[in-house]
Amino acid sequence: MRHIPDQGIGRMVASTAIVLSAACSGGGSDDASGASESPTQQASASVAPSAGAAVDELVQVKGRGLYLACTPGDGPTVVFSHGVGGQSGDWAATLSRLADIPTCVYDRVNVGLSDKEAGRHSATDDIEDLHALLAAAEIEPPYVLVGHSFGGMEMLMYAGTYPEDVEGIVLADATLPFESQLDPLDQRAEIRAELNANPEGVDFYGAYAEARALLGSIPGVPVTYLFGAQQVLPPEWEEGAYEAALHRFIDGLPDGRLVELAADHDLPLDEPDAIAEAVRRTFLGE
């Protein structure tokens, strides 16, 4: 589900560096306070790590450094994508529950520890960045894709662009391609301007059409959608329209599953247990 980007998560994890340390240690605390500063804040790595090694660095993609943190292991790698207004550190609590599973988190361009660039870019650009990032870091497919909010819609786009690389998808209250069609016609220009005034510089509203064009290419893998049923939906949407469209979306997938949670939109911070359970089930093929 979309939220206005400048609201973001609101209780963002203070340091992205905790992501790798939490996953490696299997540690339990959800509190990121006191985390040590990552060495990637001082230097940018240009040499790809060897296969099977842990990663915690900036990887050069198209001339700029993108932050990537991965833990090795057997089986498909679980790749996490944050929402607009979030960062890779938002997944720390979830990763601490998945220390035995290979995982990767990253910051998109203009986010967190990743480099900044001027101008605007598309969601398709983000997908190509992620594909190049994983290749440069020698993180081989298959992947289980996990995304929150806008990051979830981008993971659907990744699956539609590279279907042979994907074994499963977990969507944590993800923005979905049909949402712009729920907006009243006379408000769409204003909503577009509001959504596109985001700190990432991504064409948020244009991503809806990009994602819709790829829906038919999403592979028939398990897709779990975790819905924060207590969130406040945009007031301009007709009552019940979102829920009906969400059910149609899930029912239209070859292997779709909807899980309703007594939570709002901020599932990575409020429902890490539910996300971790869904990821583990998908990882194990249950």
Question: For the regions a protein language model found, what residue spans apply to each?
Answer:
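Bacterial N-terminal signal peptides that target proteins for export
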Residues: 2-13
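C-terminal motif of bacterial Sec signal peptides marking the signal peptidase cleavage site
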Residues: 21-23
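Short, low-complexity, disordered segments immediately C-terminal to signal peptides
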Residues: 25-53
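Active-site loop/oxyanion-hole signature of alpha/beta-hydrolase fold enzymes
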Residues: 105-146
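Conserved hydrolase catalytic core segment
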Residues: 140-178
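Conserved serine/cysteine hydrolase catalytic core
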Residues: 182, 192-263, 268-269
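Post-His helix in hydrolase/transferase enzymes
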Residues: 269-281
